[in-house]
A protein has these predicted regions:
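Conserved catalytic network of the ASCE P-loop NTPase/AAA+ motor domain
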Residues: 40-44, 69-74, 121-127, 138-143, ...
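Short hydrophobic/aromatic beta-strand immediately N-terminal to the Walker A/P-loop
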Residues: 48-52, 79-80, 133
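Conserved catalytic segments around the Walker B and adjacent sensor/switch elements
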Residues: 72-83
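Helix-loop-helix "sensor" segment of P-loop NTPases
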Residues: 121-127, 131, 156, 165, ...
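Conserved NTP-binding/hydrolysis module of P-loop NTPases
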Residues: 11-18, 86-105
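A short, basic N-terminal segment
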Residues: 1-45
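Mid-core helix/loop region of P-loop NTP-binding domains shared across ATPases and GTPases
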Residues: 6, 87-91, 102-147, 156-159, ...
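Walker A/P-loop nucleotide-binding motif
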Residues: 44-65
Length: 215
């Protein structure tokens, strides 16, 4: 939609664009409650949160909302993993890039333990509380998921040093039922199941979009 059409209909932006500003997103009470549990519980205690649902139900929108809101909180550093299918070494490299610390394994056996120690030292020095967002988490290798569990178990001065929010489809739920990932499942503190919107919710969303897009 070009500027002339936007002006003709009195709109600040196209309300049907996939690239909506955050204030235009329609947030249901269930999503608000999920965010409240993240802010008041997860980032205080650490561990995992889980968002599941079929493609197109809004999982990525929820992650976008969380990234913006959590990023405004004091002492919180938010990072989004963009390569969920990476191996363990590449996962650590991406974590290092996200949180400004060098995390490159130097040997196969003791390397990842050394990286956990370096990660801990970095957080002790910065006093930041990191939150990691991972979309399409069903693509993650079990070894990487287990490494995340180990990182969320690290503590310093009674502070849990990592919170992780996973989002994925039914394959993620099935993967977390594997025996080697059961310890991770026990650390999921809050869950949100996304569903396709019904008629009333769609109408409420449409009204919200038009109201926020209007001049």
């Amino acid at each position: 939609m070009n500027k002339k059409l936007l002006a003709l209909y009195g709109l600040k932006w196209n309300p049907f664009s996939p690239e909506l500003p955050t204030e235009a997103l329609y947030i249901t009470p269930r999503i608000e409650h999920f965010y409240w549990r993240i802010e008041q519980g997860l980032i205080q205690e650490g561990g995992f949160a889980l968002i599941t649902g079929d493609p197109g139900t809004g999982k990525s929108v929820v992650l976008r909302l969380l990234a913006e809101r959590l990023g405004q909180l004091r002492d919180i550093a938010v990072g989004a993993i963009t390569h969920p299918s990476s191996n363990l070494a590449d996962f650590y490299r991406e974590m290092g890039d996200l949180f400004a610390v060098e995390l490159k394994p130097h040997n196969r056996w003791g390397g990842f333990k050394a990286l956990r120690e370096r990660w801990l030292a970095h957080l002790e020095a910065t006093l930041l509380r990191p939150v990691v967002l991972i979309d399409e988490a069903q693509e993650m290798h079990p070894a990487v998921l287990n490494e995340l569990r180990l990182l969320t178990s690290l503590h310093f001065d009674s502070r849990t040093l990592l919170s992780v929010i996973l989002a994925g489809d039914a394959r993620l739920t099935n993967k977390l039922r594997r025996e080697e990932l059961l310890p991770l499942g026990s650390r999921i503190r809050t869950r949100l199941t996304m569903e396709y919107a019904g008629r009333e919710e769609l109408m409420a969303c449409l009204k919200h979009l038009l109201a926020t897009a209007g001049n």
